[in-house]
Each structure stands twice: as structure tokens, then as C-alpha cells.
């Protein structure tokens, strides 16, 4: 499926996926249930500098990964109209999109990379040692 602004590209290799994230104007993350416990795809897109649009999902990690008004736009769960409007807003407002993209890259680097996870694990082990 392809339109002037939306592309469904099907299955991609990891390398092609990364290139698509870097090229995308917006990452629309359509999950509406807690089944998406963390949102790895969301973090991957943010790491590549793609601002996100998400739904509010109480109790999930999605809204912990992307912060409303800081790294992207969060809309009420199931509000498709607000979701579409948020996508349009990020496409139309280049400055806002750039700000969210930069904040998103920093958030992922500071919290969700392997070196950061190793650092946090080492800290836990040191605390256990006493």
C-alpha cells in the first residue's frame, strides 16, 4: 500500500529498517493495549531520530519510553482522529519535530542502550556486594 504520505513496506531486513527509520518523518506506534510491554520498535525509531506518535496505554512501557511533549505526542487511547492530527502536526511543524527527534535520541541513548543497561546491572551487583 502506498499513498503520497503513508507507505506500508512489508517485512524489512534490520539494515533496511534502520534506513527507513532515519528517513521517516514520524513513527506512528499504533499499539492500544498493554501487550506492548516496553516498545522496542518505538525505542529503535527514537534512536534513529524519528519523533513518535503513541496512544496513552496505562500500565505499559510505551508511555515511559516516549514522553508526551518531550520526545513525541501521546493521544488518548483509541482516539484515531487525534492520532492522525498528531501525525499531521509533526509533519507540518518541522521545528517541533526536530526538537522531539533530538530529545528522543538522547532519551534512548541515556536510558535504553546496551552500555547503559550494563552500567545499571553493574551498579546493582555492587549494591548487592555491600
Residues of each region from the PLM?
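Short alpha-helical donor nucleotide-sugar binding micro-motif in glycosyltransferases
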Residues: 11-12, 19-24
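Acidic donor-binding loop of glycosyltransferase active sites
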Residues: 22-37, 50
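Nucleotide-activated donor-binding/catalytic signature segment of Leloir-type glycosyltransferases, i.e.
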Residues: 1-12
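Conserved acidic donor-binding segment of nucleotide-sugar-dependent glycosyltransferases
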Residues: 67-80, 89-95
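Short glycine/acidic-rich beta->alpha loop that forms part of the nucleotide-sugar donor binding site
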Residues: 34-39, 46, 58
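Short hydrophobic beta-strand element within catalytic cores of glycosyltransferases
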Residues: 48-56
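Short alpha-helical segment that forms part of, or immediately flanks, the ligand-binding pocket
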Residues: 18, 40-47, 63-64, 70
Amino acid at each position: 500500500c502506498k499513498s503520497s504520505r503513508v507507505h506500508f513496506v512489508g517485512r524489512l531486513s534490520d539494515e533496511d529498517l534502520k534506513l527507513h527509520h532515519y528517513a521517516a518523518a514520524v513513527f506512528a506506534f499504533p499499539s492500544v493495549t498493554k501487550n506492548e510491554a516496553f516498545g522496542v520498535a518505538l525505542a529503535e525509531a527514537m534512536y534513529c531520530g524519528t519523533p513518535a506518535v503513541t496512544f496513552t496505554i496505562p500500565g505499559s512501557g510505551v508511555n515511559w519510553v516516549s514522553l508526551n511533549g518531550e520526545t513525541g505526542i501521546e493521544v488518548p487511547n483509541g482516539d484515531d482522529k487525534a492520532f492522525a492530527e498528531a501525525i499531521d502536526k509533526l509533519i507540518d511543524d518541522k521545528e517541533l519535530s526536530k526538537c522531539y527527534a533530538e530529545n528522543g535520541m538522547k532519551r534512548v541513548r541515556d536510558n535504553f542502550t546496551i552500555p547503559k543497561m550494563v552500567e545499571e546491572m553493574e551498579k546493582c551487583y555492587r549494591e548487592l556486594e555491600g
